[in-house]
């Protein structure tokens, strides 16, 4: 009778071990599935962030390039205006400058 009892206890232990192994395997599988899902979600977030960052960069690049062209045009206009002002000023005072130079060159001092 004692051997039947021992035999039953061994069978119970083996069954418990098999059940525990199934529980451990199920937990391991669930953990791997959660890790895989987390990895996929992280990769998706990274891709979205990267796309948004690239879009922001391209937008800013276009804005600064457009500003650069506008700045060049504005500077050219300002330069042309300034050159025209200087030409007008030079033509206005050139007669006086020529007279002053002639006076100094032709005047003899003792």
Curated annotation (Swiss-Prot):
Q: Which residues carry this modification: N-acetylmethionine?
A: 1
Protein's cellular compartments: Cell membrane; Vacuole membrane
Sorted keywords for this record are: Acetylation, Cell membrane, Hydrogen ion transport, Ion transport, Membrane, Transport, Vacuole
What kind of membrane protein is this, topologically? Peripheral membrane protein
**Entry's Pfam families?**
V-ATPase_G
Query: Where are the stretches annotated Disordered?
Result: 60-80
Presence of keyword Transmembrane helix: no
Subunit-level organization: V-ATPase is a heteromultimeric enzyme composed of a peripheral catalytic V1 complex (components A to H) attached to an integral membrane V0 proton pore complex (components: a, c, c'', d and e).
UniProt name for this protein: V-type proton ATPase subunit G1
Specify the species: Arabidopsis thaliana (Mouse-ear cress)
Name of the gene: VHA-G1
């Amino acid at each position: 009778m004692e051997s039947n009892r021992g035999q039953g206890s061994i069978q119970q232990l083996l069954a418990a071990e098999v059940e525990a192994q199934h529980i451990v395997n199920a937990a391991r599988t669930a953990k791997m599935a959660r890790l895989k899902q987390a990895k996929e979600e992280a990769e998706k977030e990274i891709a979205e962030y990267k796309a948004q960052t690239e879009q922001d960069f391209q937008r800013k690049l276009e804005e600064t390039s457009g500003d650069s062209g506008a700045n060049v045009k504005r500077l050219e206009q300002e330069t042309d205006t300034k050159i025209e002002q200087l030409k007008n000023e030079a033509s206005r005072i050139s007669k006086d400058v020529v007279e002053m130079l002639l006076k100094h060159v032709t005047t003899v001092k003792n």
